[in-house]
Amino acid sequence: MSNVMQQPKIGFVSLGCPKNLVDSERILTELRTEGYDVVPRYDDADMVIVNTCGFIDSAVQESLEAIGEALNENGKVIVTGCLGAKEDQIREVHPKVLEITGPHSYEQVLQHVHHYVPKPKHNPFLSLVPEQGVKLTPRHYAYLKISEGCNHRCTFCIIPSMRGDLDSRPIGDVLAEAKRLVEAGVKELLVISQDTSAYGVDVKHRTGFWNGSPVKTSMVSLCEQLAKLGVWVRLHYVYPYPHVDDVIPLMAEGKILPYLDIPLQHASPRILKLMKRPGSVDRQLARIKQWREICPELTLRSTFIVGFPGETEDDFQMLLDFLKEARLDRVGCFKYSPVEGATANDLPDQVPEEVKEERWNRFMALQQQISAERLQEKVGREILVIIDEVDEEGAIGRSMADAPEIDGAVYLNGETKLKPGDVVRVKVENADEYDLWGSLV
């Protein structure tokens, strides 16, 4: 008969954005380190943790449904994450939830787990945790979160009320985590935060230390150091501050990926003012032109909102005109949706749903045409591709221009001997609006 004690089991569900995924990874790493077993089925677990999203109404609904499912299948549920900042809203629907915490409340979550499912007598030989921690992404890429919160007060957003003001991680800690990930086999680091280009503003860009040398806490310094690790480094959620210009030469030199994810949101100065976003469209177009002159391989991704309160046909036409001139590579578009607690809800002249839908369709049709033309320019060229999946039909990867889950893919039909994480040279043979097809060189 075995004398090995049964490890307590925790079920876990993670909803929302990559930043939430990083929070989940941190909680799971601590649980595994303490000897808890993480299981895929709620009915096998001693307790379930639901890490929620509360950014838009559909995310709130998804989170509430996930909580309900966990309660039905298990009964012992702890809720954390962004929606946890609205405890009353959760308890109104699910009064039987045991405990509720807000986002990045790691220690509170663990304390609650210890209370309801006491910490096991940990045997390190039974529950080994890799040095880089538990990761919910494939082994070859990882999200690297550099800060929490945001100092902006965009009228459509409630993130600051949930995650607080900007709180930058010490640059030495960020770089140490990046190094551990690379040593564990990660080939691509995706730098994320609510506002990546504001990194270090809250600490007045104080000097930190890495490998015994002083390093300034700033996005540019961080990129310079990450470049030394010899892996792909991709920047997300980059607010268009002037100093963003300083990272473009690093991209041109091949030190970090020539990829910028800049959420511009709109192009009408009047709508941008209502959103409390920077509003110089001409300046932004000039910068895009300058960036491309310095780094011709640059891929630009952005997101936009159509149907924002007060948006007229003239405002929307300005947005379409901007798309035609900017010719962005990757674009996401959302129909404005009221978010509980957002100040934009109180703005006059709400746009009817059918108008939002019609504008969204026009926006997407134009951008699909632009995207198809941009990708067609790559046919006949050779590009580097990182492999994500391999099955009996071939391999699927991404180019330097493609972030996981949100951008396009590169299909290599018949290439069944590659492995996820391989970086290969590919000749592009075909393209559509979003994806490429090619063969190994």
Curated annotation (Swiss-Prot):
Question: So which residues are the signal peptide here?
Answer: none
Query: What residues does [4Fe-4S] cluster 1 bind to?
Result: 17, 53, 82
Quote the EC number: 2.8.4.4
In alphabetical order, the GO MF annotations are:
4 iron, 4 sulfur cluster binding; aspartic acid methylthiotransferase activity; metal ion binding; protein methylthiotransferase activity
| Keyword terms | 4Fe-4S, Cytoplasm, Iron, Iron-sulfur, Metal-binding, S-adenosyl-L-methionine, Transferase
Specify whether Iron-sulfur is a keyword of the entry: yes
The superkingdom of the source organism is: Bacteria
Species whose genome carries this gene: Cronobacter sakazakii (strain ATCC BAA-894)
A Pfam family name for this chain? TRAM_2
Residues in TRAM domain copies? 376-441
Q: What's an example GO cellular component term for this entry?
A: cytosol
Q: Which GO terms describe its biological process?
A: tRNA modification
Stored InterPro entries: Elp3/MiaA/NifB-like_rSAM, Methylthiotransferase, Methylthiotransferase_CS, Methylthiotransferase_N, Methylthiotransferase_N_sf, NA-bd_OB-fold, Ribosomal_uS12_MeSTrfase_RimO, rSAM
- Its chief place of residence is cytoplasm
Read off the NCBIfam families from this record: 30S ribosomal protein S12 methylthiotransferase RimO, MiaB/RimO family radical SAM methylthiotransferase
> Which cofactor is recorded for it?
[4Fe-4S] cluster
Q: Which SUPFAM superfamilies match?
A: Radical SAM enzymes (SSF102114)
| Start and end residues of each MTTase N-terminal domain | 8-118
Does the keyword Metal-binding feature in the UniProt annotation? yes
Q: How is the cofactor bound?
A: Binds 2 [4Fe-4S] clusters. One cluster is coordinated with 3 cysteines and an exchangeable S-adenosyl-L-methionine.
Provide the protein name. Answer: Ribosomal protein uS12 methylthiotransferase RimO
Q: State what this protein does.
A: Catalyzes the methylthiolation of an aspartic acid residue of ribosomal protein uS12.
What compartments host this protein?
Cytoplasm
What this protein catalyses is: L-aspartate(89)-[ribosomal protein uS12]-hydrogen + (sulfur carrier)-SH + AH2 + 2 S-adenosyl-L-methionine = 3-methylsulfanyl-L-aspartate(89)-[ribosomal protein uS12]-hydrogen + (sulfur carrier)-H + 5'-deoxyadenosine + L-methionine + A + S-adenosyl-L-homocysteine + 2 H(+)
Q: Pinpoint the Radical SAM core domain residues.
A: 136-373
Quote the Gene3D superfamilies the UniProt record gives. Answer: Methylthiotransferase, N-terminal domain, Nucleic acid-binding proteins, tm_1862 like domain
